Amino acid sequence: MSAVLDLTCELIARPSVTPDDAGCQALLAARLKQAGFQCDHLRLGDVDNLWATHGLGAPVLVLLGHTDVVPTGPRESWTSDPFTPHIRDGVLYGRGAADMKGSVAAFVVAAEQFVADHPDHPGTLAVLLTSDEEGDAIDGVRHVARLFAARGQRIDWCITGEPSSTATLGDLLRVGRRGSLSAKLRVQGVQGHVAYPEKARNPIHQAAPALAELCARRWDDGYESFPPTSLQISNIHAGTGANNVIPGELDVDFNIRYNPHWDAPKLEAEITALLERHGLQYTLKWHRSGEPFYTPEGTLRAIARAVLAEHIGRAPEESTGGGTSDARFIAPLGAQCIEVGPVNASIHQVDENVRVDDLEALPGLYQRLVERLLV
């Protein structure tokens, strides 16, 4: 097997369901140390974080990834055991194959080869890994970014190995991400018998106009490469299960994916004003997952576009779509951030997989990116 395939299989065999690293970072740190990297373990609580650096000074290029994976779901639904890597018809199967143990393995193989070829390279090459990307994302890169901000750690460029490709490796370059804001809304009513509505207050009826306005609102028309801001209701519940009882309260969960027209405080104020205008008796709890970030045209984008175009024979699509990633914690440090990784068709699914040809091409892509940025 190739170096990257062998290492990916070793990582898949470690059942690192978030936030358990299951020994992945110890394995990777040993390899990076052997290649000459300085490794610092920044563990917090149950979360493992690894910061490995080679070289000194600016510019600083970070390869950002995570060693944790999502749960497998019913293991009997998998064609083969999710933590026993299997290759069938040129495809590697296993939890984390695409998201993102393949990218992490490719980072390490590319870093090893780069420092072997350029032992005295300018600037600093760093690898940052966490076991808290798929979970709460509090004690992982968010924590490390706070440490970096406190000590003035500079980061110029960040390449995240999230599975960004859609049909073929390198067909999409992620140049930003939307912000994410979640809310839990509870509308208070008065429970009663459906035959005596005058003695009750139905929170469903009261909240319906406000929810309709929230869902119908056009928040903006997009922002540069970003789509329009979107609010989606994800859960709604009221009632006792009986059809003769007016419920006493209504619970609604919703999420907003927003572009740089907005920030979390502005959205919170806007929605609070709407609820107040409808005269609801309510409580509202917010959870801020991260603000949007965007990498404008510049050195990193231009080099990444050129490297991917060489691989696929055409310019990649450049997008800010998809969910959140840990790059949202690195961007506020002043870094230009992009995401380049495998095809994402099977991520978080039963029989997650990556094409072996794509996996074996990935270290070369990453190494070319590093060389053009640092050499």
From Swiss-Prot:
Any one Gene Ontology BP term: diaminopimelate biosynthetic process
Keywords: Amino-acid biosynthesis, Cobalt, Diaminopimelate biosynthesis, Hydrolase, Lysine biosynthesis, Metal-binding, Zinc
Active site positions: D68, E133 (proton acceptor)
CDD domains: M20_DapE_proteobac (cd03891)
Entry EC number(s): 3.5.1.18
GO MF entries: acetylornithine deacetylase activity; cobalt ion binding; succinyl-diaminopimelate desuccinylase activity; zinc ion binding
Family: Belongs to the peptidase M20A family. DapE subfamily.
This protein's name: Succinyl-diaminopimelate desuccinylase
